[in-house]
Amino acid sequence: MSIVEIKQQATQKMQQSLESFQHNLTKIRTGRANPGLLDTVHVDYYGSMVPISQVANVALLDARTISVSPWEKGMGAKIEKAIRDSDLGLNPASQGDLIRVPMPAMTEERRKELTKVVRAEGEHAKVAIRNLRRDANDGVKKLVKDKLASEDDERRSQEEIQKFTDRFIADVDKLVTGKEQDIMAV
C-alpha cells in the first residue's frame, strides 16, 4: 500500500466516522420537532419490522409537531403504538388518518443531561478519528521501515494526516456546539 492510498483510506474512514456521528446526533431529541427523530422507530408490517418512513409519510406540521400519515388505513394504530413504545418519550395522538406527534417541552435538568450525552458522543467521534490518524501514521512508518518510502515522505505525510485529522475534529466540535445550542434553546 502506498502513502497516497494510506492517506485516502484514512480520510475516507474519518469521513465515515463523522457521518456516523452526525447520524447519532439526529437521534438525540431537542426541543424542536425533527422528522429524522422517528427514523429509529420500527413498526410491524405484515410480519416484518420496518422503519415508519417505509409505511407512512413523516413531515413537520410546525416547529414542535411531527405528522405521520400512514399509506394504509390499518397501520395507524400500529404506528401510534410503536411511537409510544419507543424510548423517545413521545405521546402520539391520532386524528383520523393523521397521527400528530407533539414534542414535549424539556426540563432544564433534561437539557443539561442531553448536553452531556452530546459531548460524550463527540468525544467518542474524536477518539475514533484520532485512532484512524494513529493507524495511518503507523502504516506510513511501516513503509519507511520496509524502505518503501523516505523519512522526508514520512514527515510530510504525517503533517498532512494531522491537518485532515484537525479538520475532522473541528467539524465534530462544530456539530457538538450546534446541537448543544439546539438543546439549550427554549
UniProtKB/Swiss-Prot annotation:
Main location: cytoplasm
Entry keyword set: Cytoplasm, Protein biosynthesis
GO terms of biological process kind: cytoplasmic translational termination
SUPFAM superfamilies cross-referenced by the UniProt entry: Ribosome recycling factor, RRF
Keyword Cytoplasm found: yes
Family indicated by similarity: Belongs to the RRF family.
Function: Responsible for the release of ribosomes from messenger RNA at the termination of protein biosynthesis. May increase the efficiency of translation by recycling ribosomes from one round of translation to another.
Protein's recorded name: Ribosome-recycling factor
Protein's organism: Polaromonas naphthalenivorans (strain CJ2)
